[in-house]
């Protein structure tokens, strides 16, 4: 997956997160929507982490394609 692909996925996920948050402001989300929001947030964390890995590998002369998405439990606990 190229950086542009990761960024495209990030943009799609961010748009969906925005839709869900807007809906949340207007009404209560269904259980399914709350689950989807949690999934979107997690997938965004994974994508941002993957993009950071790719950029770091490139900066230090390593193959960015060797970067792999980390486990959800790993990226969930990162401090921003």
Residues of each region from the PLM?
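Extended, charge-rich alpha-helical interface modules
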Residues: 1-80
């Amino acid at each position: 997956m190229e950086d542009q692909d990761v960024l495209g996925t990030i943009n799609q996920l961010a748009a969906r997160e925005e839709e869900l948050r807007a809906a949340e402001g207007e009404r209560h989300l269904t259980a399914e929507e709350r689950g989807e929001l949690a999934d979107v947030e997690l997938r965004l964390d994974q994508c941002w982490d993957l993009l950071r890995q790719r950029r770091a590998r490139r900066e230090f002369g390593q193959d960015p394609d060797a970067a792999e998405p980390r486990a959800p439990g790993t990226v969930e606990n990162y401090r921003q």
